[in-house]
């Protein structure tokens, strides 16, 4: 194993499952499992059962012990000591210290394993204290209306025991995730078994850090409330009271390693009495993304879940891009996403949008914003190879004017909130669902402008051969075109205060520059 000095100090790098991977420290794993049981097991509370976590690594070699006992892990090793191959005696003494006699009924493990899973009062209070009073999670306008409707629907489900599914639609910056976290808090406060679900880990990690202010103990205490759809196929029917599925447009049929998985939309609906899907179909960015309204409707009919989709479940008000619907319309216009062009009034747009001719100048301008304490990140589409990951070179993104940068592949889970991540370029998977003060978008050769036909053109062949996730290179032309446009719309709408753009295609650069000079015009 090898120490990984991330900002939370709970990971190690090791060779497992035929690959070099970053995994959780065993003491952290043991402690996190004990937190889950304390927070959810009714039996532990009722029977006054104590939990003492530890880790036994029966095959871990003594010469590597110093790696796991590195001082940066002392918080976790203090809470859950670990024992290795030649420490059987010490491990035995530790167990004997805390287990002195047989439980009175002899069924202690059975009680824990078969006990009712419900959030404890301590977990309810912990989550509520993090959300309430946190300005990042205040509900506004139609968010509050939708929130109230979701609470009433949950009450109805509990009353008549009938499955229901709510679809909440909203474009970029309409507050879908804020609504989702508030719903999670309220359902947990009602002692309901609920979880916040996203396919991608980046939004989960970001909200965990935001809620806990990166306090390691607080984070591990609520981490089990934020989960992946992975392995939901093993869940009992209505095993959850509610699953709140954010970024639902990114759901897929199955993830690698989820051998029992069939369809994540189906599995979310099947596993919960009430399933809530928050989505934006225009943000589907790979050929595997299946979280559409039609897909959800199909599985509702199949599984007997009543579908709720109405005016109250549509979020329209814009809280990103300085609250400007005009900017979102402007992005749609320059990407020519609609057949009919519309007039976009940018005269009162209080949003810092710039197009740069030099990628180094754009990075320098963004770096200044970042140093001024504005949360700033650089992002790009699928065009650039993963040279560093595959040991083919020192740089991934190489542009004119000797611009060089790396992808964020090493620490993609925390890239959005790690203050040291500015110099790395984020991909769609780590940026989607998140927001920054300023975002810099590198538009590659997959998107160009034809001045003769005055049209935006996409080029699936420009997608990197290292891209094994989007499926764009082998997609049908129309599908590839849609996914490329969706990708750039998503990236261009990550900023709250500003968006800086560099285009590899000179004609596209000029087209966008001319577009923003006209305050109101059919582009």
Region locations from a protein language model:
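Hydrophobic anchor at the beta1->P-loop junction of P-loop NTPases
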Residues: 168
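Accessory nucleic-acid engagement/destabilization modules that flank
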Residues: 1-110
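Conserved RecA-like ASCE ATPase "motif II neighborhood" in helicase/translocase motors
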Residues: 213-271, 423-427, 487
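Signature of the SF2 helicase/ATPase Hel1-core->accessory helical subdomain module
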Residues: 244-310, 314
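C-terminal accessory regions
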Residues: 276, 424-522
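Conserved helicase/translocase motor-coupling segment
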Residues: 180, 286-291, 305-329, 336-454
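Conserved lysine of the Walker
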Residues: 176
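N-terminal pre-P-loop "Q-motif" helix
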Residues: 135-164
């Amino acid at each position: 194993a090898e120490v990984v000095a991330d900002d939370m100090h709970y990971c190690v790098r090791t060779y497992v499952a035929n690959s070099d991977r970053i995994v959780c420290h065993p003491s952290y794993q043991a402690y996190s499992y004990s937190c889950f049981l304390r927070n959810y097991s009714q039996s532990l509370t009722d029977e006054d059962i104590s939990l003492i976590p530890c880790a036994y690594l029966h095959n871990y070699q003594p010469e590597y012990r110093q790696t796991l006992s590195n001082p940066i892990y002392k918080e976790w090793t203090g809470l859950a000591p670990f024992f290795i191959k030649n420490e059987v005696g010490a491990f035995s003494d530790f167990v004997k210290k805390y287990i002195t006699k047989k439980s009175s009924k002899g069924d202690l493990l059975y009680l824990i394993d078969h006990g009712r899973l419900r959030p404890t009062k301590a977990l309810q209070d912990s989550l509520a204290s993090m959300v309430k009073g946190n300005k990042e999670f205040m509900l506004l306008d139609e968010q509050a209306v939708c929130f109230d409707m979701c609470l009433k629907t949950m009450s109805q489900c509990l009353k008549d025991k009938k499955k229901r599914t709510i679809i909440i639609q909203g474009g970029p910056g309409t507050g879908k995730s804020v609504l989702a976290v508030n719903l999670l808090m309220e359902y947990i406060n009602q002692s309901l078994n609920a979880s916040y679900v996203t396919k991608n880990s980046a939004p989960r990690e970001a909200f965990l850090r935001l809620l806990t202010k990166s306090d390691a103990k607080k984070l591990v205490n609520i981490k089990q409330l934020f989960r992946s759809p992975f392995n939901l196929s093993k869940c009992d029917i209505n095993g959850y009271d509610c699953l709140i599925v954010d970024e639902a447009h990114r759901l897929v049929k199955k993830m690698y390693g989820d051998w029992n998985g069939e369809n994540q939309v189906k599995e979310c609906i099947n596993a919960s009495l009430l399933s809530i899907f928050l989505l934006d179909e225009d943000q589907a960015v790979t050929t595997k993304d299946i979280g559409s309204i039609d897909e959800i409707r199909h599985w509702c009919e199949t599984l007997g879940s009543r579908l709720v989709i109405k005016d109250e479940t549509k979020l329209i008000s814009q809280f990103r891009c300085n609250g400007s619907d005009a900017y979102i319309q402007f992005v749609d216009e320059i990407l020519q996403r609609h057949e009919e062009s519309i007039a976009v009034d940018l005269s009162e747009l209080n949003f810092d949008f710039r197009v740069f001719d030099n990628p180094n100048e754009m990075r320098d301008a963004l770096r200044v914003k970042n140093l001024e304490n504005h949360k700033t990140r650089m992002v790009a589409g699928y065009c650039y190879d993963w040279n560093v990951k595959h040991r083919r070179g020192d740089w991934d993104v190489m542009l004119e004017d000797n611009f060089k940068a790396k992808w964020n592949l090493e620490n993609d889970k925390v890239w959005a909130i790690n203050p040291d991540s500015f110099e790395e370029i984020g991909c769609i998977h780590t940026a989607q669902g998140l927001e920054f003060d300023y975002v810099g978008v590198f538009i590659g050769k997959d998107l160009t402008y034809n001045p003769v036909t005055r049209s935006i053109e996409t080029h699936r062949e420009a997608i990197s051969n290292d891209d094994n996730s989007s499926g764009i290179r082998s997609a049908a032309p129309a599908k590839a075109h849609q996914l490329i446009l969706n990708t750039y719309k998503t990236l261009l709408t990550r900023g709250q205060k500003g968006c800086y753009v560099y285009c590899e295609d000179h004609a596209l650069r000029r087209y966008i520059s001319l577009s923003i000079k006209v305050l109101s015009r059919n582009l």
